[in-house]
């Protein structure tokens, strides 16, 4: 399902970035708008359910989008959201927004580090991780995408590009179990 969403989201993401740059909207504005939309969608389960509801008319969905987002985002970003509604893609809004943010970061030469942690990071821990990742990857700008997952027990995992760093207790236990299992044979 994720691959299909990604396949569907990619053309919309590329088209919106091209449209926003042609309309002289800065990448900073685009990223700020999309990040705000992503946060609101993540925080409001009811909004996500409303936009995914096939029984709700396109007109009603557009009214909801206008009421929530119009005062806070640029006109071009609002137009993009309304076009997605017209095309029947409001249910895929989260994946389209995620893809668009990812493309905007690439265009702005910002590397995204996906961090999964057992407990929330403080701002000092985030800054220290960014600095360490910068030195490891020779990247000038890194944006952290942090997810809290209690099943890690402790520690964290980082994926940046194709590199994965797993310092979690869950990962260490998995590695130990694998090692013990292979040496017993």
UniProtKB/Swiss-Prot annotation:
HAMAP family documented for this protein: ATP_synth_delta_bact (MF_01416)
Role summary: F(1)F(0) ATP synthase produces ATP from ADP in the presence of a proton or sodium gradient. F-type ATPases consist of two structural domains, F(1) containing the extramembraneous catalytic core and F(0) containing the membrane proton channel, linked together by a central stalk and a peripheral stalk. During catalysis, ATP synthesis in the catalytic domain of F(1) is coupled via a rotary mechanism of the central stalk subunits to proton translocation.
InterPro entries: ATP_synth_OSCP/delta_N_sf, ATPase_OSCP/d_CS, ATPase_OSCP/dsu
One Gene Ontology term, aspect cellular component: proton-transporting ATP synthase complex
Keywords: ATP synthesis, CF(1), Chloroplast, Hydrogen ion transport, Ion transport, Membrane, Plastid, Thylakoid, Transport
Organism expressing this protein natively: Guillardia theta (Cryptophyte)
Quaternary organization: F-type ATPases have 2 components, F(1) - the catalytic core - and F(0) - the membrane proton channel. F(1) has five subunits: alpha(3), beta(3), gamma(1), delta(1), epsilon(1). CF(0) has four main subunits: a(1), b(1), b'(1) and c(10-14). The alpha and beta chains form an alternating ring which encloses part of the gamma chain. F(1) is attached to F(0) by a central stalk formed by the gamma and epsilon chains, while a peripheral stalk is formed by the delta, b and b' chains.
A GO term, aspect molecular function: proton-transporting ATP synthase activity, rotational mechanism
Protein localization: Plastid, Chloroplast thylakoid membrane
Transmembrane segments: none
Coiled-coil stretches noted in the UniProt entry, renumbered to this chain: none
Membrane topology of this protein: Peripheral membrane protein
Family membership noted in the UniProt record: Belongs to the ATPase delta chain family.
Cysteines joined through disulfide linkages: none
Protein name: ATP synthase subunit delta, chloroplastic
Gene that this polypeptide is encoded by: atpD
Domain of life: Eukaryota
Gene3D superfamilies attached to this UniProt entry: N-terminal domain of the delta subunit of the F1F0-ATP synthase
């Amino acid at each position: 399902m994720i691959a299909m969403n990604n396949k569907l989201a990619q053309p919309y993401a590329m088209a919106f970035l091209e449209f926003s740059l042609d309309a002289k909207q800065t990448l900073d504005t685009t990223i700020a708008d999309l990040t705000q939309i992503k946060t609101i969608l993540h925080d409001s389960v009811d909004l996500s359910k409303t936009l995914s509801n096939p029984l709700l008319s396109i007109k009603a969905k557009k009214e909801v989008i206008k009421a929530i987002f119009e005062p806070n985002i640029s006109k071009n970003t609002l137009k993009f959201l309304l076009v997605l509604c017209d095309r029947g893609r409001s249910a895929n809004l989260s994946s389209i927004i995620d893809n668009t943010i990812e493309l905007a970061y690439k265009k702005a030469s910002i590397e995204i580090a996906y961090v999964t942690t057992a407990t929330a990071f403080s701002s000092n821990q985030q800054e220290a991780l960014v600095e360490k990742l910068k030195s490891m990857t020779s990247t000038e700008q890194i944006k952290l995408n942090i997810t809290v997952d209690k099943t890690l027990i402790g520690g964290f995992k980082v994926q940046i590009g194709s590199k994965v760093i797993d310092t979690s207790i869950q990962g260490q236990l998995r590695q130990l179990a694998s090692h013990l299992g292979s040496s017993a044979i």
